[in-house]
Amino acid sequence: MAKSNGENGPRAPAAGESLSGTRESLAQGPDAATTDELSSLGSDSEANGFAERRIDKFGFIVGSQGAEGALEEVPLEVLRQRESKWLDMLNNWDKWMAKKHKKIRLRCQKGIPPSLRGRAWQYLSGGKVKLQQNPGKFDELDMSPGDPKWLDVIERDLHRQFPFHEMFVSRGGHGQQDLFRVLKAYTLYRPEEGYCQAQAPIAAVLLMHMPAEQAFWCLVQICEKYLPGYYSEKLEAIQLDGEILFSLLQKVSPVAHKHLSRQKIDPLLYMTEWFMCAFSRTLPWSSVLRVWDMFFCEGVKIIFRVGLVLLKHALGSPEKVKACQGQYETIERLRSLSPKIMQEAFLVQEVVELPVTERQIEREHLIQLRRWQETRGELQCRSPPRLHGAKAILDAEPGPRPALQPSPSIRLPLDAPLPGSKAKPKPPKQAQKEQRKQMKGRGQLEKPPAPNQAMVVAAAGDACPPQHVPPKDSAPKDSAPQDLAPQVSAHHRSQESLTSQESEDTYL
């Protein structure tokens, strides 16, 4: 497949047609003409009146295609309560993920508070852990020159990403600069994969909620954990998921499945942009954010559910099917979905209640993969296994998070005084008897041999499990006794605690 050149117009590939135009066609939406017109304002758009335009709560220009009308506002008291609960979860993240993951899932379904959404996405996706594991990596990639063949394509795509949003309205503005940095860094981080233009809207949404470095690592997690293979050259993963979606549709909405089968409409004609852009180009913005909240928590299952809900309500009744007699009418219906079925409260409720599980998706994936191998041979792009949400990512890659303790623990020798005590602790009675017998047998007074076990004591009084020490018989009898020097645990060496770690996390 030819690499993207950023020049083809917006269209979906026909059934059986090559996917060579898919990677570039996603860069241009249906409003490409107005996009270019708006971007022609350049970086002086503020001087030409942009500063006087009203901006909605999401950062879109009021009256533009990205802006929304009246929204269901969450009462301020409820919002503050949710913020308090989320702050507690984020400050004790490992504990909540280990013991109360279901509660996190329920709170993601209710919606993450806007002030904490960016931080929560970093924790849910594992991007926070990746950043800690790779300090300075993004700066290193950012300072590198990059591959010219990708830089030209990325630069041409910058003004097409949410041109009615205040971050990206100005050509060469800070939003477009950060978007360029993130996408260029990814081409250097994964040179074998390069750049797919569907990654641009994903990165842009992340940049609306967090700085460039954090957005980069969240993008890495999406491409490698949530949607592996989606942005590879052959787009094999998205083709497989198209077949999975179509198979699941038969159980969710037989009427819609039968109609699409009769019209011989390939799933790639309607689901490619949905899945590759995670509905960021399809749904109203309030719905996009709610879908992403659940997506980061529960994984690609949410993307499948949203697609199935849209298909079910667009083509799921005989009356709706009668209005779509041909392929063109059907495709137009799916491209111009009713605002009612995309409305935030309605869509989220339908998605939560739809009984489609990870097990069903994985079972269907094996079936479709077997069919692919029988008809087309082996996959050319080997992508890592897909992980279904935050819990699976945490279990697969826990990361070096600090232990949930009030203070670091230290190791003390047995004969050292305990914290807060003045006297040196006496050895056990059994050890005293053995020492007396040895001294009587030798006829001389000797210093008692140093103990061979260390006692681990927490600085705050919390006991930690003792380290393994070789048995007493393993040491040579004629060796001179030596005092054990105090040793510091690995946790103490890291000089990390929950408080110090979270104090660095001030970006909301």
UniProtKB/Swiss-Prot annotation:
At which residues is Phosphoserine found? S39, S40, S45, S407
Superkingdom per UniProt: Eukaryota
- Site positions (Arginine finger) are R156
Where is region (Disordered) located? 1-46, 396-508
Describe its partners and assembly state: Binds to the first PDZ domain of NHERF1 and NHERF2.
Q: GO CC annotations?
A: cytosol; extracellular exosome; microvillus; plasma membrane
**Where in the cell?**
Cell projection, Microvillus
* PTM comment text: Exists in both phosphorylated and non-phosphorylated state.
Q: Where is this region: Binding to the PDZ domain of EBP50?
A: 505-508
Protein name, UniProt field: TBC1 domain family member 10A
